[in-house]
Structure formats: structure tokens, C-alpha cells
């Protein structure tokens, strides 16, 4: 087990054959215990609080039972590092600056980095957002990456290839694969 880094999400459940995002603490706890059982381990390295894209959601997570549970699991050694996943640099920045997370899972790629902050992650795929000339990194994203570096918050990347779009010349906002 010591040769692997396990990253797993809190706040996700599998119900009736479907993924569901949840902040209901009973579901969060049951899902996490089920995860440990299914992975046949007594701890995970990174407990990633799933999909926090709005400031309101971050405030609810940070000040509510989800963060309290994550910290409790960390104190018990069931989670080594607390993480958070987000597509929105504004919400992610709040989390990073709070000191409550050790790891940020963030959508990083050459096209998304040119997009401004948005609470709707589906806007990242909207073609009209790429109609304007994209020449500079979004300042909020640049500040987020610098802040993570300065505060020692690790970044784990999601959507490095934009869900595959960046590998397809016709789908890539850059017009090249």
C-alpha cells in the first residue's frame, strides 16, 4: 500500500447506478467508509472534497459538517491530506487561502487557462468563449497557481486535455490538436 498514492473524493455517492454529488453528511460518511472497504485500505492519502465551484458552496463546506468530517478523518489517520476539486479560480482561491486544504484538484490546460472565472464549469466547453482572441493567461488563474506555490498547496490536474477536445483538431478551441 505504501507504494501507491490514493486520491479519493468525499461528497460523491453511487446511487441506483448513478453518480451523485452530495453535501448531506450521512451520505458523505457512508460513502467514505464504503470506499475504504472497497479499496481494502484503512486510509487514503488525499481526501478530495468534490466539485466546489461557487463561493457559497465553499463557505458551506468550510464552515459545515463536510470540512469537520474531513478534519476528523485526518486526525484519525484515515485521510493524510485534505483536498478540494474546483473548476472556478475564485472559489479555489478562497479554499487555498483558508489554510484548510493541502491539495487543490483544478482544471489546468492551455485553453482553460485563458478563460475567466465562472461558476458554471460547462462554460469551459462553450465554443463562443473561444471566439475572442485568447493570448494571455487569465489573471485569476495565474494568481491561483502562484498562491498555491507560495502557500505550499499542491495542485493535482484534471482535464489536462480538455476532456479530449485538445486532442482533436476539429474540437480544439485552438484549432489544432
Label each residue range with its predicted role.
Residues 52-177:
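Beta/alpha (TIM)-barrel catalytic core signal, keyed to glycine-rich beta->alpha loops juxtaposed to Asp/Glu
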Residues 23-40, 86-94, 176:
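Short, acidic/polar
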Residues 10-29, 55-59, 167-172:
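Active-site mouth loops of central-metabolism enzymes
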Residues 6-8, 45-48, 84-85:
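Beta-strand segments within the central parallel beta-sheet cores of soluble alpha/beta enzyme folds
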Residues 1-8, 42, 75:
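N-terminal binding-site loop/beta-alpha segment at the start of enzyme catalytic domains
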Residues 9-11, 49-50, 160:
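Short loop/turn segments at strand-loop or loop-helix junctions that form parts
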Residues 34-58:
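Active-site groove signature of glycoside hydrolases
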Amino acid at each position: 500500500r505504501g507504494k501507491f498514492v490514493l486520491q479519493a473524493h468525499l461528497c460523491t455517492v453511487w446511487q441506483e447506478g448513478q453518480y451523485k454529488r452530495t453535501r448531506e453528511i450521512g451520505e458523505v460518511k457512508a460513502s467514505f467508509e464504503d470506499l475504504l472497504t472497497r479499496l481494502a485500505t484503512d486510509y487514503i492519502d488525499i481526501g478530495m472534497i468534490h466539485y466546489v465551484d461557487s463561493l457559497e458552496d465553499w463557505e458551506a463546506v468550510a464552515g459545515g459538517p463536510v470540512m469537520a468530517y474531513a478534519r476528523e478523518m485526518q486526525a484519525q489517520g484515515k485521510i493524510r491530506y485534505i483536498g478540494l476539486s474546483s473548476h472556478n479560480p475564485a472559489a479555489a482561491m478562497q479554499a487555498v487561502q483558508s489554510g484548510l486544504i493541502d491539495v487543490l484538484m483544478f482544471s489546468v490546460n492551455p485553453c482553460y487557462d485563458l478563460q475567466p472565472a465562472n461558476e458554471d464549469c460547462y462554460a469551459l466547453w462553450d465554443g463562443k468563449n473561444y471566439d475572442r482572441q485568447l493570448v494571455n493567461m487569465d489573471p485569476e488563474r495565474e494568481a491561483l497557481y502562484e498562491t498555491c506555490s507560495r502557500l505550499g498547496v499542491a495542485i493535482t490536474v484534471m482535464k489536462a486535455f480538455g476532456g479530449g477536445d485538445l486532442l482533436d483538431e476539429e474540437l480544439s478551441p485552438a484549432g489544432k490538436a
